[in-house]
Amino acid sequence: AKESLFNVLNNRFDFDEIRVLDLFSGTGNISYEFASRGTVDLIAVDQNRNCTRFITATSEALDAGIHVVQADALQYVRRASTSFDLIFADPPYDWDHYEDLAKSIIDLGLLREGGEAILEHSDQTDLSHLPGFFAHRRYGHVNFSFFSRPQDLTEEDLSLIHISEPT
């Protein structure tokens, strides 16, 4: 699923020119993938101290320059003072605040012009009714919902809103 996601993103972004926020970063796999593709403006947020220590140590060993923050992801988003080109979030599948997170990202202006937020979730979560939603992709049991600033969505984008299962 990660490789397929990055194939999609590779067609939309110049990784070395974007600011990325990785929420619920866990052991940092998504952050390392962005760093390996040239992203230098990268923030990884996780609440677990062991995870943030691991990401910090790994980032230093790889000279990846990832800025690591130990914080609750939703609280971090609500207090963020900067905007991002790409926000990736992989909360636990049983997390109760997917809608709050998506709405906060859009309502608080955390996406730059042309920016996207991607939330990973289970089959049981449907975020397609939320403002800024424009696509859903499914890779096996892994689901990604894509969001952008509503003002960035064109009529063509809105007509393309879809749920897809790539083969």
What are these regions (language model features)?
Residues 1-160, 164:
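Class I S-adenosyl-L-methionine-dependent methyltransferase catalytic core
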